[in-house]
Regions:
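Beta-propeller-forming repeat regions
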Residues: 21-210
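Sec-dependent N-terminal signal peptides of Gram-positive bacterial secreted proteins and lipoproteins
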Residues: 5-26
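N-terminal secretory signal peptides that target proteins for export/translocation
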Residues: 1-3
């Protein structure tokens, strides 16, 4: 127990350094819409159909390295990028990340990640599992409170699977043990916990474990 607490204390100190600006994370790739072309127009038509069908509007992430309303990433590792549109609709679970795959030159909606909240706080594309492709880490602002919601997802065969979900005040995605897979380290401050809570999530035995 003491060893675990000491480990979390060291991680908390590392996160403090990251938040203070001592380490600057570079962006390896910018996820943006393709240039105007037939492909661009087809993607736009596919997204417009979802916008009108769900009475939704664009809802770009408000912070982090990826703040475009529509982003491109090869989520499943097949060599072809998926398009992810970040939208907000009415009703329950209004925040929606819509994933479009390209088939024979056309884009088709393959899955939707729905979540609660008022806005997308951040979006990152990282290698969590060591499997082909990259995972999607989404932060959501729940309300005007400090706490936010963080979820990680994998995408394979046209379907999304949630890997973890937790509330957080601050988080970082870093490879702490040098195995080539990123770990998720988060801090959570609550009124009843004046010292805060530190949690580490890493891929072990086929799942994200805390």
């Amino acid at each position: 127990m003491h060893g675990k607490r000491a480990g979390l204390a060291l991680l908390a100190a590392a996160l403090t350094l990251l938040l203070s600006g001592c380490f600057v994370k570079t962006v390896d790739e910018l996820y943006t819409l393709p240039r105007h072309s037939d492909e661009y127009d087809r993607l736009e038509l596919a997204i417009d159909a979802v916008l009108s069908g769900q009475s939704a509007v664009y809802s770009a992430p408000v912070s982090g390295p990826n703040q475009q309303s529509v982003q491109l990433a090869d989520l499943d590792g097949d060599g072809q990028e998926e398009a992810i549109a970040f939208l907000k609709a009415a009703g329950d679970r209004p925040l929606r990340a819509c994933i479009f795959s390209r088939v024979d030159g056309d884009y088709h909606l393959t899955d939707v990640i729905e979540g609660d909240g008022t806005s997308f706080a951040s979006v990152e594309y990282v290698q969590l599992t060591g499997q082909p492709g990259i995972e999607l880490v989404i932060g959501r602002q729940l309300s005007t409170d400090v706490l936010q919601s963080l979820s990680a997802y994998s995408y394979s065969d046209g379907h999304v699977a949630e890997l973890m979900n937790a509330n957080y005040s601050e988080y970082r995605v870093v490879d702490l043990d040098g195995d080539g897979r990123k770990d998720i380290f988060l801090l959570r401050f609550e009124a009843e916990q004046p010292q805060g809570i530190a949690e580490l999530y890493r891929w072990q035995a086929g799942q994200m474990e805390r």
